[in-house]
Amino acid sequence: MATPVEPPNGIRTPGKHYYSMWQSLFEIDTKYVPIKPIGRGAYGIVCSSVNRETNEKVAIKKINNAFENRIDALRTLRELKLLRHLRHENVIALKDVMMPIQRRSFKDVYLVYELMDTDLHQIIKSSQTLSNDHCQYFLFQLLRGLKYLHSANILHRDLKPGNLLINANCDLKICDFGLARTSSGKDQFMTEYVVTRWYRAPELLLCCDNYGTSIDVWSVGCIFADVLGRKPVFPGTECLNQLKLIINILGSQREEDIEFIDNPKARKYIKSLPYSPGTPFSRLYPNAHPLAIDLLQRMLVFDPSKRISVMEALQHPYMSPLYDPNTDPPAQVPINLDIDEDLVEETIREMMWEEILHYHPEAAVALLWKLFYELLLVPSRHRP
């Protein structure tokens, strides 16, 4: 349990209470009690709580010094902008973002999500038996959430088992949208690290100038293989080794299957690799359902233009018993995530403040009244 503490300056802000957790101060809205630590990492510290007003169980993520690293600050801003618009059973819901006390100098950001029990990475490495029904249901939900994202014009770009949250009912929700981009974004191409290496599509490993929704499909294929085999299918040690592992399993590619590689040096490297006949997925995963193997090999196709789409995957015989297109509407409107990568800290902070206001309409109204009164007072200061 977190330890209640006094505020650092001795002055208690109305509506806030204070906790110490892993030597970090949490300044939490009083409607959230009790506060229990869950985990910590490079992303920040996470605790569980209950919203007393709604009785909902939530996860509170504190991002400490959110603006210390500009790239990380942009990731947080991007996630805020995106999750405000997304509403889907298989996408994590951002319930609240706590209102900072100081608009122009706040450093920490507190994000409040719906609470989940674990993630797919933890399940894969556990001793928990996974039946075909488990594998099928996890994949179905992942594809269903991804179809929704793609219908909103969004590429996730960082799908991996650790970014798929699971609860005790085996419900799955996609999370961590800090690397997400609109699929038509003009500055999306290889501007930064994209997708954890083991789940990175060949077109990204080969630094192709153009990529699309098929990069997410490749990641889904890698994740599904991990579930079937209970270990990573392509655990590369670095970029070139990653490509070698892919070719070893998929087999050497024909000339027409590498035409998408626009970099001559990259194409030459692929052609220089020793010949591999490939390894059938049915041999790698002998206990998997034959239809699961068929769908897997349609997702893990080297040439992105020949890779199965999310919609096609949902209509595949392995998924069709679960999929009903009539209960799976697309996103209402495409979402634009284009954000200037060169924004300075002050601008990012102000944009984040504006996003936070969407979760606090009462604060937004109070701010409008304040501006209104200030405008009324301006003429009186200049009267003779």
Curated annotation (Swiss-Prot):
Entry-annotated residues carrying Phosphothreonine: T191
Coiled coil: none
Reaction(s) catalysed by this chain's protein: L-seryl-[protein] + ATP = O-phospho-L-seryl-[protein] + ADP + H(+); L-threonyl-[protein] + ATP = O-phospho-L-threonyl-[protein] + ADP + H(+)
TXY, short sequence motif: residues: 191-193
PTM characteristics: Dually phosphorylated on Thr-191 and Tyr-193, which activates the enzyme.
Residues engaged in binding ATP: I38, G39, R40, G41, A42, Y43, G44, I45, V46, K61
Cross-referenced CDD domains: STKc_TEY_MAPK
Residues bearing PTM Phosphotyrosine: Y193
Tissues showing expression: Expressed in vegetative organs such as leaf, root, or stem. In the reproductive organs, it is found in the ovary, but not in the stamen.
Active-site residues per Swiss-Prot or TrEMBL entry: D158 (proton acceptor)
Pfam families on file: Pkinase (PF00069)
Cofactor requirements of the protein: Mg(2+)
SUPFAM superfamilies: Protein kinase-like (PK-like) (SSF56112)
Protein kinase domain mapped to chain residues: 32-319
GO molecular function (one): MAP kinase activity
Summary of activators and inhibitors of this protein: Activated by tyrosine and threonine phosphorylation.
Family annotation (PROSITE patterns): MAPK, PROTEIN_KINASE_ATP, PROTEIN_KINASE_DOM, PROTEIN_KINASE_ST
Keywords tagged on the record: ATP-binding, Kinase, Nucleotide-binding, Phosphoprotein, Serine/threonine-protein kinase, Transferase
E.C. no: 2.7.11.24
Family: Belongs to the protein kinase superfamily. CMGC Ser/Thr protein kinase family. MAP kinase subfamily.
Comment on protein domains: The TXY motif contains the threonine and tyrosine residues whose phosphorylation activates the MAP kinases.
Entries under PANTHER family matching the protein: MITOGEN-ACTIVATED PROTEIN KINASE
Designated name of the protein: Mitogen-activated protein kinase homolog 1
Gene this chain is encoded by: MPK1
